[in-house]
Amino acid sequence: HIAGGSSVYEIINQYSALNTDENSNMPARDRRFDVTLLINGLPMIHIELKNKQHSYMDGFRQIKKYIGEGKFTGIFSAVQMFVISNGVNTKYFSAASDTELNEKFVSGWLDQENNPVSDYIDFAKSVLSIPQAHEMIARYTVLDKDAKRLILLRPYQIHAIEAVREASKNGKSGFIWHTTGSGKTLTSYKTTRNLLMDIPSIDKAIFLIDRKDLDTQTTMAFQAYANNDLIDVCLLYTSPSPRD
C-alpha cells in the first residue's frame, strides 16, 4: 500500500516503439525496448540491458538516442526513472529530454553500509522489487519547478530519510549529517515532506535556518519543490540576532 491505496504492478519486455514522426527528415526506424516496469498501467521505470562485453554507458547513449527520436512520448512520457546495466555494473538516473540528459546525474546504488550494489540481480532486489520500486517513484523523486527537471534522490539521501522516518514512528529523534554539496536542502525537504505524508500525528514541520544568507535560498528551493507536491511551504518568522 503506497500512497494510501492498492496498486497493480506489471513488467513488459521487448516492446516495439514504432516510428511515428512523419515530419522527421531521418529514415523511419522502429525501436525495441528491453524491459519496462508499469505501476497501475503506466510505464514508470525503463531498463536497458547490455551484455558484459559492453559498457553500461552504451545503455545511457541508447536511451538518449531513443528520446531524441521521440520514442518516449505518449504513454511512455510517464517514465520517471531509467536503469542501465551490463550485468556487473548497474546505474540509474531520472528522465529528461535528450538535450538535458547528463552523465553526471547517473548514479549507482549503495546499501545502508555504503557498499556498492552493482550486480543487476542485487540491484533489482534492492531497488526494483516491490514496494521499493514504487517508493523510488512516489517518495524519492522531486519535480523542481524552477529548474524544470525531475530529480531522483541518491542512495545516501534515501537511507537517511528512511532512518528518520523509522525513528519518528518509534517516538525517537535524530539528525542527518551531510557535507557541503551533498544535497542538504533537497534531503531536508524530502525528510520533512515524507514525515508529513506518512505519519498522521505530524501536522506541521518547522524548518530552522541558522544563517541569514541561506534564508531566501532555502525558501525558494522548498517552494520550487513543493509547487508540484502535496504540501504547502510558508515563510513564518525571521528572528533577530540573539545579541539584539
Where are these regions (language model features)?
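ATP-dependent helicase/translocase motor core
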Residues: 1-209, 213-229
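Conserved small/polar residues in nucleotide/adenosyl-binding loops
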Residues: 237-244
